[in-house]
């Protein structure tokens, strides 16, 4: 099994972090650490989405239809 988490797992982890921070029941140090983890997850999620978009564009171009996605 791959060590890399799936997109859905990372998204769920990010949602837990956001919920913790929104509740405000964490100490400042923990809030900062959670925020940093959340930012890292956010970047990983965005990279996954960008990669998926490029894959779709490539597939669509090979099919001869759409050449650009926005």
UniProtKB/Swiss-Prot annotation:
One of the GO BP terms on file: DNA catabolic process
Q: Name one GO molecular function term.
A: exodeoxyribonuclease VII activity
Q: Which chemical reaction does it catalyze? A: Exonucleolytic cleavage in either 5'- to 3'- or 3'- to 5'-direction to yield nucleoside 5'-phosphates
EC assignment: 3.1.11.6
Q: By its UniProt entry, which Pfam families does this protein fall under?
A: Exonuc_VII_S
Top-level lineage group: Bacteria
Alphabetized, the UniProt keywords read: Cytoplasm, Exonuclease, Hydrolase, Nuclease
Q: Which GO terms describe its cellular component?
A: cytosol; exodeoxyribonuclease VII complex
Q: Where in the cell is it found?
A: Cytoplasm
Give the top-level enzyme category. hydrolase
The record's InterPro entries line, in alphabetical order, gives: Exonuc_VII_S, Exonuc_VII_ssu_sf
Q: How does it assemble?
A: Heterooligomer composed of large and small subunits.
Q: What does this protein do?
A: Bidirectionally degrades single-stranded DNA into large acid-insoluble oligonucleotides, which are then degraded further into small acid-soluble oligonucleotides.
Under NCBIfam families, the record lists: PRK00977.1-2, xseB
List the PANTHER family: EXODEOXYRIBONUCLEASE 7 SMALL SUBUNIT
Q: Which family does it belong to?
A: Belongs to the XseB family.
Quote the HAMAP family the UniProt record gives: Exonuc_7_S (MF_00337)
In Swiss-Prot or TrEMBL terms, this protein is called Exodeoxyribonuclease 7 small subunit
Question: Its encoding gene is what?
Answer: xseB
């Amino acid at each position: 099994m791959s060590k890399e988490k799936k997109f859905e797992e990372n998204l769920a982890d990010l949602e837990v972090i956001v919920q913790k921070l929104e509740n405000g029941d964490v100490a400042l140090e923990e809030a900062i650490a959670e925020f940093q983890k959340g930012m890292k997850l956010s970047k990983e999620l965005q990279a996954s989405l960008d990669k998926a978009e490029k894959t779709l564009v490539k597939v669509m171009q090979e099919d001869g239809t759409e050449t650009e996605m926005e």
